[in-house]
């Protein structure tokens, strides 16, 4: 009996030695064990708000996009399906308010551009019907205000401006608009428009080089005046100067398994949140300061269940809450920060 306990103790000490040796000396010995020991610790930044929304039965289609009007505390959701409302409106507390369906064919991206003076909702429509291949501005109640593109007709033209499966947009408080045009369409381009819809600069062409794209799927801005584009097909994020359009660099090292499908910054500007569709994963990447973007560094992840498929996400610029449109789970989920944010910039 004594010999048995001596053997147990010896085995325990030997296992402890292997673990410490692997930790401090980089030994590959543990790789052959049937269990995995991870020495990487991640910051836990967010938790799921299991009570949002209050009544999920209002999700009657496939939820592709979500945006937040942080001025008025409203959440807009775009869903697809036959004979259903395409746009749902909830409060940030999760209560359903209303729905509308006017002149919306197939929503892909959505953005709430709200100031103290105007509240509007922009939608990229990739439908093949009369309302498709457009970027449209609505009032908060669904009244059509502005149409960019040639409704129902895809194209590459700039005068008049045409789109082919415009994926998403970002609207600055100044009114300037950034559009990623090419969710599998002809264009693969990033366009900046002035508030009166004149083209200020653009980058576009299918390819793998700098300022070329393969499915530019999401776009956002940071407080340093940089434009960040999820170049999904090329498995990278490209960065540009918002004023000149100059290419500033790319992150290639963090997305080798799956390209990024959505990008948004936390309100304090510390982290870029990246959704990866087919991995069903959200990653929190350290945001670089002014200057070189360097290499990306993931400091936290949220691994969702298989086939949840997070498509596009949005961040409430006041509270820091993250809303994720999941096309696999056909729902939008809300994640809240463990620590309160102090609003700093409109991302």
From Swiss-Prot:
- Asked if the keyword rRNA processing belongs to this entry, the reply reads no
The places in or outside the cell where this protein is found are: Secreted
Give start-end of the signal peptide.
Answer: 1-25
A Pfam family per the record: NHL
Protein species of origin: Pongo abelii
UniProt keyword terms in alphabetical order? Glycoprotein, Repeat, Secreted, Signal
Q: Where are the NHL repeats?
A: 47-93, 150-196, 200-243, 294-338
Glycan attachment residues as annotated in the record: 32, 101, 206, 278
| Keyword Hydrolase in annotation | no
The UniProt entry, under InterPro entries, shows: 6-blade_b-propeller_TolB-like, NHL_repeat
The name this protein carries in UniProt is NHL repeat-containing protein 3
Q: Note the superkingdom of the native organism.
A: Eukaryota
A GO cellular component annotation here is: extracellular region
């Amino acid at each position: 009996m004594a010999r048995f306990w001596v053997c147990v103790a010896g085995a325990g000490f030997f296992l402890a030695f292997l673990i410490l040796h692997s930790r401090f000396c980089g030994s590959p010995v543990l790789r052959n064990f049937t269990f995995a020991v991870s020495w990487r610790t991640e910051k836990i930044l967010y938790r799921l708000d299991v009570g949002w929304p209050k009544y999920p039965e209002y999700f009657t289609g496939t939820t592709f996009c979500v945006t937040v009007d942080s001025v008025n505390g409203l959440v807009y959701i775009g869903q697809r399906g036959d004979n259903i409302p395409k746009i749902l409106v909830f409060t940030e507390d999760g209560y359903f308010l209303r729905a509308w369906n006017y002149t919306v064919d197939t929503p892909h991206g959505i953005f709430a551009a709200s100031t103290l003076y105007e509240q509007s909702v922009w939608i990229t429509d990739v439908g093949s019907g009369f309302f498709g291949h457009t970027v449209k501005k609505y009032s908060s109640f669904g009244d059509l205000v502005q149409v960019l593109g040639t409704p129902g007709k895809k194209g590459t033209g700039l005068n008049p401006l045409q789109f082919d499966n415009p994926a998403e947009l970002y609207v600055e408080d100044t009114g300037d608009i950034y559009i990623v045009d090419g969710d599998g369409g002809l264009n693969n381009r990033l366009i900046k428009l002035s508030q009166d819809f004149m083209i200020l600069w653009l980058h576009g062409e299918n390819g793998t080089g700098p300022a070329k794209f393969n499915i530019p799927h999401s776009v956002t801005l940071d407080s340093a005046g940089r434009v960040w584009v999820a170049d999904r097909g090329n498995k990278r994020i490209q960065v540009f100067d918002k004023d000149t359009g100059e290419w500033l660099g790319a992150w290639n090292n963090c997305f080798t398994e799956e390209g990024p499908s959505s990008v948004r910054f936390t309100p304090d500007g510390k982290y870029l949140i990246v959704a990866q569709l087919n991995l069903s994963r959200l990653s929190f990447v350290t945001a670089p300061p002014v200057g070189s973007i360097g290499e990306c560094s993931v400091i936290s992840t949220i691994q969702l269940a298989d086939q949840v498929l997070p498509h596009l996400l949005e961040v409430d610029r006041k509270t820091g809450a993250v809303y994720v449109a999941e096309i696999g789970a056909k729902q939008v989920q809300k994640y809240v920060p463990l620590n309160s944010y102090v609003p700093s910039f409109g991302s």
